[in-house]
Swiss-Prot record:
Function: Binds to the 23S rRNA.
Family: Belongs to the bacterial ribosomal protein bL9 family.
Keywords: Ribonucleoprotein, Ribosomal protein, RNA-binding, rRNA-binding
Pfam families registered for this protein in UniProt: Ribosomal_L9_C, Ribosomal_L9_N
Stated name of the protein: Large ribosomal subunit protein bL9
Gene Ontology MF: a single term: structural constituent of ribosome
Matching PANTHER family: 50S RIBOSOMAL PROTEIN L9 (PTHR21368)
Organism: Ectopseudomonas mendocina (strain ymp) (Pseudomonas mendocina)
Signal peptide extent: none
Gene Ontology cellular component terms for the protein in this record: ribonucleoprotein complex; ribosome
Species classification: Bacteria, Pseudomonadati, Pseudomonadota, Gammaproteobacteria, Pseudomonadales
InterPro entries named in the record: Ribosomal_bL9, Ribosomal_bL9/RNase_H1_N, Ribosomal_bL9_bac/chp, Ribosomal_bL9_C, Ribosomal_bL9_C_sf, Ribosomal_bL9_N, Ribosomal_bL9_N_sf
Superkingdom of source: Bacteria
Amino acid sequence: MEVILLEKIANLGNLGDKVNVKAGYGRNFLLPQGKATAATAENVAAFEARRAELEKLAAEKKASAEARAAQLAELEVTITATAGDEGKLFGSIGTHDIADALTASGVEVAKAEVRLPNGTIRQVGEYDVALHLHTDVEATVKVIVVAA
């Protein structure tokens, strides 16, 4: 299935690229989420008419993500959790908890933007957590987990 990308998608292409994808990926993910449109003759013409508007929108999203990354670079978040004698948490600190703590400290962060490659945090200590704010913008924030 051939589609026109309406935004940059990792490992696939940039805004305006005409790419071939598997039919299920196109029909079930790209088209419903508005990330692509089918590459018919009329859709190609409609896309070319809106190209400048879409590029401007993409640039605004990237600039917004870069501004948030600059705010997050100097941010340090402390999360309090109940823990045992040896620093092992009762439960864990996940992406939702980190996103809530960052939002409470003044920078809006969605749960899906938080990356924990080693899984949830289960020990007291300091952690560098990666944030994926945009396809081109990554940020790192220091999360300190202390026992309650």
